[in-house]
Every structure is written in C-alpha cells, then in structure tokens.
C-alpha cells in the first residue's frame, strides 16, 4: 500500500514510440514495414491522455502510416501533451523542443494545446497545434504535412480493438470526456470542457472487443467516472438488444457480466457511489474504489469547491467496509492548500488515522496557471508545505504498512505483469497498474504476463508484498475468497 509524493520529474507519465526517452511499443505493436509515411509518437500525462493517443495511432495505422521507434526514422512526430500543473507544462514544452531538435517536424495535441500562444512563443516552428481529444483534426494535420500512404496490406491486420499502448492483458476504458465540477485547484474543465458521456452501447461494444482480444482487466476512467450519464439525463441506450441506462451502476452491472476484472478510477464521491458497493461484494466488479477526497477539513473543502466532510466520509467508509469487507480504497489529498492552518492539517492527519485508507497519493499544493485557488489569501510557505507533506507521508506510511502486513498468511489471486531475473511480478485485485503496489513471486519463472495464479503472502512492507505460489492452483474453492475472481 503506497503513499505517493509529488515529484515534478514524474508528474506527467511519458509514453512514447520513440527510443528517446522510452520505447513502449513492442515489436508486434510497431509495424516498421517500411511502407508509407512514418510517424513517431510521444504521449504525456494521465491514462485519459493515453487513450486519446491510442485512438490517434489506431486511425493512422488503419490509414497505412507506419509507427516507428526513433526520431531519426520518423518523417513527423506527434506530441500529445499534458497541461494539468506547471511541472507538466514544463515537461510538455521540453518534449516538444526535444522533438523539434531531433526531428524538426512536430504536431502538438492534448491539453496544453489550448495554450497555443504559449507554445508558439517558445516553439514557433511546430507544424500544427490542436486541443485535447481532437482526433480527427490531428489526423487531418498529418494528411496536410505527410502524403497519405498507398494501401498498406499490413494495415488490414489492425485488430478491432485498435492500437493499445498498455500490456495485452489490461486496457483503459474511457467512458466520458470533460467535467462539470469547478474545483478551485483544477483547470481540466477549461481544457477538456464539460462532461460528455459516451453512449452506453458504444462503451460496452468496446469492452466486449477488448475482452475478445485477450484483455483480462478493464480500468474504467474519465475525468469524473461517477457522473457518467448526467449530461444526457441517464437516457436509455441499447446493447445486445436490451435497454441499458447511461448510468454508472447499470454500466458496471453489464461490465460485470463479462467475466473479467473491472476496476473503477476517478470516482467522485456522489451519494450513488454507495450503490456500487454491493456489486463489488458480489464479485461483479473489483472491490477497489479510487475516490479522491482531497482533504478532511470542512472549511478547506469549501475553499476547494469539494463536497463532504470528515464525519460524513468516515460514516460512508465504515458502511462500505461493512457491506464489502474486502474493499480497498485509494484516495488523493492536497496538503498546504492556501489558507490551511496547522489545526486544519492536524484534522487531516486525524482523519487518516481513523479512515485507515489502503492507498493514498499526497501532493503539496502547487499553483496552476488559471486555477482560481491561486487568488485565495494566506498561501502556505513552501517549507511548511513540504514539512506537512513529510508528516502526512509518515502517518499514512505506517497505516499502509500495517494494512499490508495484515495480509500475511492469506491467499490471493495474482495477475502476472512481468517476469524478470528475480522471478514473476504481479498484482492482486487491490493493486492498480502503475500507481499501486506489486506482488513479488521470487523464483517463479514458468508464467507469462496475463496469467493468473494463486499465491500466499509471506512478507510485506509499506509498498509491496512478497508471496509464494499456493500448492493447489486448480481448486478455487480451497482458496480464500478475499481475492477477486
């Protein structure tokens, strides 16, 4: 169970088809057939941005463009940017500069694209700039600057689920775009607009295609997952000839029938989230809830334009755990928000001790250009913010370590993510990829990514656990039911 601190050097997850700095397309994902015009691609930021990158790459590959692994091999480079906080803006601008230096022909898209003047002031030679989720515009700009390839026979081999930048056994499923909330620390609505929900049948069709392609875990994402369907008044759609409402609960019910892991991320704490807990307890979706609380003090929450209070959240957490004892809760918090007093910070620490959350991400408040919170009085000095962040980490670190050590002696189903020199590395239902802990199966080599095995936890620290394979892998009734199946 992890506590993440804010690291400006890691704030934007960088995914790229280029060897500089990281190559992520495996040989079977990158065509490299030497046919048609060649594209390099860099994707920065969150999983929502990664899904946008997948859509753009899928369209380009379908049209016959070749995706290549180096700047030098590319005829043009696309940079999908992040602009959420200042450190992400800096990394995006640096990456654009790197692509221009190494290649010279660059198209910019993504969240930072809404600040075209800022980009062109620093990088006037970029070919084109588009905003987020502007898939068709990006492709049109590629057409303008690179000839559309003649028919590439390898393009016919693009699978129905499209190009994926994740390992084969899990995938992100984005169900909506934008957000209707106006949190004072956030500028996402100004970049991505208000909530726009995808048709429920469209979402379920994609989920089915992903399952048929071998995906065993769906990570449901959006800017505000629990608001799904609010913009269309939860209208009824159809899937497989049956009516299904554009609503989070009914979507989860249908996804739960597919027989694969379904994990919910970015869940805003609406009251109807309570209705999802029975689905988790029944094994329809994973008993895992990524729900950002941000703070515990009522006054600070009001300044953030966030709902709730410590008392109400604690009541709900207690109720959820009574209904679903195996529930794992991930949350994020901001310390050092403008105006936060020592007493209000201590209230946050008291909340942590009582809530006993499983996974926590912690961030010292950082001003974001355009955020209304920047205008609030009494900013917290940087040294105090960092001191509070360290204290927050210490408290949550002890909680995380204790909760993981309580798993020692229990058996869990583990999905294998990789095999290295020390053995297999995987995750339980309690571990989302990239952000949570790992299960280390030292000495286990005869497995491959995507396999599922049963294992008993024998050791833990505040981040990861170590486990050994259970003797009987086939008798599921003999194993603990705590791990999701």
From Swiss-Prot:
Q: What PROSITE patterns does this protein map onto?
A: MTTASE_N, MTTASE_RADICAL, RADICAL_SAM, TRAM
Q: Where is the MTTase N-terminal domain?
A: 37-147
Cofactor(s) annotated in UniProt = [4Fe-4S] cluster
Q: What class of enzyme is it?
A: transferase
Q: Domain Radical SAM core: where? A: 165-402
The record lists [4Fe-4S] cluster 2 as bound by 179, 183, 186
Q: Where in the cell is it found?
A: Cytoplasm
Cofactor binding: number and manner: Binds 2 [4Fe-4S] clusters. One cluster is coordinated with 3 cysteines and an exchangeable S-adenosyl-L-methionine.
Q: Which residues are in the TRAM domain?
A: 405-471
For this record, an example GO cellular component is: cytosol
Show the GO MF annotations. Answer: 4 iron, 4 sulfur cluster binding; aspartic acid methylthiotransferase activity; metal ion binding; protein methylthiotransferase activity
Q: Which residues bind [4Fe-4S] cluster 1?
A: 46, 82, 111
Q: What does this protein do?
A: Catalyzes the methylthiolation of an aspartic acid residue of ribosomal protein uS12.
Q: Name the PANTHER family on file.
A: RIBOSOMAL PROTEIN S12 METHYLTHIOTRANSFERASE RIMO (PTHR43837), RIBOSOMAL PROTEIN US12 METHYLTHIOTRANSFERASE RIMO (PTHR43837:SF1)
Which HAMAP family is this protein grouped with? MTTase_RimO
Its recorded name reads Ribosomal protein uS12 methylthiotransferase RimO
């Amino acid at each position: 169970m992890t506590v993440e601190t804010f690291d400006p050097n890691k704030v934007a997850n960088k995914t790229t088809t280029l060897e500089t700095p990281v190559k992520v397309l495996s040989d079977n994902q990158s065509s490299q057939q030497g046919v048609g015009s060649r594209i390099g691609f860099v994707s920065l930021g969150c999983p929502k941005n990664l899904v946008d990158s997948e859509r753009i790459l899928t369209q380009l590959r379908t049209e016959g463009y070749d995706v290549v692994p180096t700047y030098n091999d590319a005829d043009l480079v696309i940079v999908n940017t992040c602009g959420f906080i200042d450190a992400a803006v800096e990394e995006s601008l640096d990456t654009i500069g790197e692509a221009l230096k190494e290649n010279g022909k660059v198209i910019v898209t993504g969240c930072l694209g809404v600040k075209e003047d800022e980009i062109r002031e620093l990088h006037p030679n970029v070919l084109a700039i588009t905003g987020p989720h502007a898939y068709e515009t990006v492709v049109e700009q590629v057409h303008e600057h690179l000839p559309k390839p003649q028919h590439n026979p390898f393009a016919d081999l693009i699978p129905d689920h499209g190009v994926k930048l994740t390992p084969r056994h899990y995938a992100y499923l984005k169900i909506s775009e934008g957000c209707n909330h106006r949190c004072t620390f956030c500028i996402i609505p100004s970049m991505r607009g208000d909530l726009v929900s995808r048709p429920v049948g469209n979402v379920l069709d994609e989920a089915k295609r992903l399952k048929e392609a071998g995906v065993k875990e769906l990570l449901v994402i959006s800017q505000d997952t629990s608001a799904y369907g609010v913009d269309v008044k939860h209208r009824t759609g159809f899937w497989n000839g049956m009516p299904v409402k554009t609503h989070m609960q009914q979507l989860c019910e249908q996804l739960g029938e597919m027989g694969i892991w379904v994990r919910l991320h970015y869940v805003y704490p609406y009251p109807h989230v309570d209705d999802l807990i029975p689905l988790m307890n029944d094994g329809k979706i994973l008993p895992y809830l990524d729900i950002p609380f941000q703070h515990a003090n009522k006054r600070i929450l009001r300044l953030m334009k966030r709902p709730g209070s410590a008392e109400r959240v604690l009541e709900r957490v207690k109720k959820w755990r009574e209904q679903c004892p195996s529930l794992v809760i991930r949350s994020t918090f901001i310390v050092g928000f403008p105006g936060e007093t020592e007493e209000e910070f201590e209230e946050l620490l008291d909340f942590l001790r009582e809530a006993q959350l499983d996974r926590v991400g912690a961030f010292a408040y950082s001003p974001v250009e355009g955020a209304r919170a920047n205008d609030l009085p009494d900013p917290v000095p940087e040294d105090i913010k960092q001191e509070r962040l360290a204290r927050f980490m210490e408290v949550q670190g002890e909680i995380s370590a204790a909760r993981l050590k309580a798993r020692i002696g229990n058996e869990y189903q583990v999905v294998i993510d990789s095999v290295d020199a020390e053995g297999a590395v995987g995750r339980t239902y309690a571990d989302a990829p990239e952000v949570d802990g790992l299960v280390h199966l030292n000495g286990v080599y005869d497995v491959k990514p995507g396999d599922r095995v049963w294992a008993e936890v024998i050791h833990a620290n505040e981040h990861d656990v170590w486990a050994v394979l259970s003797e009987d892998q086939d008798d599921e009734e003999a194993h603990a039911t705590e791990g999701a199946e």
